[in-house]
């Protein structure tokens, strides 16, 4: 299973809250800076089980991941968490309502390669030190066939995310806002010009 999320709400706490509720999974992120490696190791020690890492560095996956290596790292849990609004790797542009949304294709391609479920997941802060984790409807498996229907997958994920985001718009992180671009008010027949403008920002 691959859980995809956004830079929304207290996203940094999501891996720990999932583990606290018995949902063991590994989140993909950029490598920790050297000055924080000691703290990172300490955090890992507080988040059992020890044989399933809390985080997996993007450098460990690489641009051409070996599935056997990833399965070995994930261990028996087989769960991976990834952000889809990061400006890293191959990108996909999906029109949604009055916006053009940029998303990374890595989680989608990995789910297709692993034949894994792709599930939208968001965490929100409902009050001080109170959080709710929202699991959306998984992406239909036929969208993940070979080749995957990227636009259909992107639209499905955005529809699921929007049900939560519209209730808590103040919890949008700046990185999430940077992944959204306004569409012209009168619409556009060819999105390529809008995509080009977005890529040039």
Task: Enumerate the language-model features and the residues they cover.
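Non-catalytic C-terminal accessory region of glycerolipid acyltransferases
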Residues: 20-24, 47, 63-201
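Catalytic core of membrane glycerolipid acyltransferases/transacylases, capturing the structured
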Residues: 1-60
């Amino acid at each position: 299973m691959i859980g995809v999320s956004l830079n929304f709400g207290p996203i940094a706490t999501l891996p720990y809250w999932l583990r606290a509720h018995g949902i063991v999974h590994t989140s993909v992120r950029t490598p920790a800076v050297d000055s924080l490696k000691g703290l990172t190791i300490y955090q890992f020690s507080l988040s059992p089980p020890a044989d399933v890492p809390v985080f997996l560095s993007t450098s460990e996956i690489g641009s051409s991941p070996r599935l056997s290596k990833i399965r070995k790292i994930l261990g028996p849990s087989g769960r991976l968490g990834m952000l889809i609004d990061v400006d890293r790797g191959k990108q996909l542009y999906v029109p949604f309502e009055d916006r053009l949304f940029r998303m990374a294709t890595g989680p989608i391609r990995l789910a297709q390669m692993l034949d894994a479920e792709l599930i939208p997941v968001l965490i929100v802060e409902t009050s001080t030190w109170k959080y709710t984790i929202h699991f959306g409807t998984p992406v239909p498996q036929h969208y993940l066939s070979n080749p995957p229907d990227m636009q259909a997958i992107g639209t499905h994920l955005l529809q699921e995310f929007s049900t939560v985001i519209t209730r808590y718009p103040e919890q949008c992180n700046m990185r999430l806002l940077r992944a959204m671009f306004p569409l012209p008010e009168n619409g556009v027949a060819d999105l390529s010009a809008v995509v080009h403008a977005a890529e040039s920002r």
